Amino acid sequence: MNEKNTLFNWFKLVVKRDLVLSFKKIATFMVPLVFFLIVITLFPLALGTEGSFLSTLSSGVIWVAALLASLLAVESIFNEDYRDGTLDQFLISGEPTFILVLAKVLAHWLVTGAPLLLASLISTFFLYLPEGLLFPLLISLLMGTLLLSLLGALGGALTIGKTAILSAVIVLPLSVPILILGVAI
């Protein structure tokens, strides 16, 4: 019982630490959110404002924008901790590594995925999403953005210290099945 409590406290500590650090750097969560909103805003401008045409594309546009926006924040999962030596301290602490990874993924999702989820709720009005598809879209985005954060952790871990584009090249092909399943609502 004491070991479970210690692991949960470790988990909470890492999540809280990452959230505090992320909100100190406003660009960490604002860049993906602003990118998402720009993409959503440009689609009706580029394709016209005909409601029936936009409504057929709306869930796909939201999903593609969410996928591309989440790729912008992939490098921030582990790179800063690697640069300042915190990641090494985490690894030699003796705590299970999976707790660290899950905590960092949850913090990453709370900083990038949750705002995208809220922004997608607003963006459905721009794209004339049919009312019956709103709830399934939000549920699929909830699960999909969590999975994208997990894949982002994989790409971020494989490319620690490298350029951000490399992690995007690794994560993008792996995220295509999530995109296909998410759009098929």
Give short role names for the model-derived ranges:
Residues 1-31:
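Aromatic- and glycine-rich beta-strand/loop motifs that create alpha-glucan
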Residues 26-48, 63-67, 170-181:
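Hydrophobic alpha-helical transmembrane segments of multi-pass membrane transport/permease proteins
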Residues 46-57, 121-142, 185:
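Membrane-interfacial helix-loop-helix connectors in multipass membrane proteins
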Residues 58-74:
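Long, hydrophobic alpha-helical segments
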Residues 71-91:
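Transmembrane helix boundary and interhelical loop/hinge segments in multi-pass membrane proteins
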Residues 95-109, 136, 167-169:
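Membrane-interface alpha-helices at helix entry/exit sites of multi-pass transporters
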Residues 102-127, 147, 179:
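Hydrophobic alpha-helical transmembrane segments that constitute the membrane-spanning cores
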Residues 143-172:
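A structural motif at transmembrane helix-loop-helix junctions in multipass membrane proteins
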